Amino acid sequence: MTGLPKSVEITSDEMMEALEEPLFTICEAVHNVLERTPPELAADISNSGIIVTGGGALMYGIDKRIQERTGIKVIIAEDPKSCVAIGTGKSLDILDKLESNALNRRAPYL
């Protein structure tokens, strides 16, 4: 070992194998959240699907793997690497409204 960085190529299959356990945990979390979600909202989620965001959404086959495990349609966001930052920025623009709404409704999930 030289201690210097080096590049290594791995296949999509090798990447998915390495992600088996974290994907299992994510899918279990989806099931747990849906169990605690009001039925009408859970039905909407089941009908509309799960939108996957972030750079990990670009990994080949991750949408199919999550869909197989949850039984819910999975959609990759249009711009998965940027959409979380864009949404956060939009939320900050209306932060007063969001806080007021959360306080007025005493929303248990916020």
Residue ranges with predicted function:
Residues 1-110:
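Helical "lid/coupling" subdomains associated with nucleotide-phosphate turnover
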